[in-house]
């Protein structure tokens, strides 16, 4: 998958990609967009930390490639901060595209000033140990979706959606088609037409 294709996924955004993918791959939990306005897509580097521990986050940043989306998980989601400003600074310096944290983050004002796109399940100052060796680049589950290393993660204000690389070309084409269709529809809606009529819903409801 080229950088251009990642950029296109990011441009179309989570909702459009999710619908174009047949309503598949949505990470079905509330994610906090730490840096407002962030819109990113990139390949997943998956991380499973030990319970209450973030040693593997340090390892992940050391092994990350530019453009990676780090997917940070615990054995069970918990409001424990896996990332603060020091780790975020390192990730940013190594050109990580984004962090998806199925746990908490802290130092939020500093994170926003840094500007690294981060999505987390919680904001919490509660810290971790650094003792337990977990795993890198093995499948993890977030919000009911299994994420494998290299899966495309699309993130924006609506949350996150996962696209397997094997489906990327098909989903991107469907996304482009859906976006083009909506672009032609919007002026008609602005002019006062209704999807109730345009999509045949009136006939379904009223006969």
Describe each PLM feature range:
Residues 159-161:
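Channel- or pocket-lining gating/hinge segments that regulate access to a cavity or pore
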Residues 1-149, 163-195, 200-207:
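Feature captures the catalytic cores and cofactor-binding loops of soluble hydro-lyases/lyases
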Residues 153:
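C-terminal binding/interaction regions
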Residues 156:
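Beta-strand-loop-alpha-helix segment that lines the small-molecule cofactor/substrate pocket
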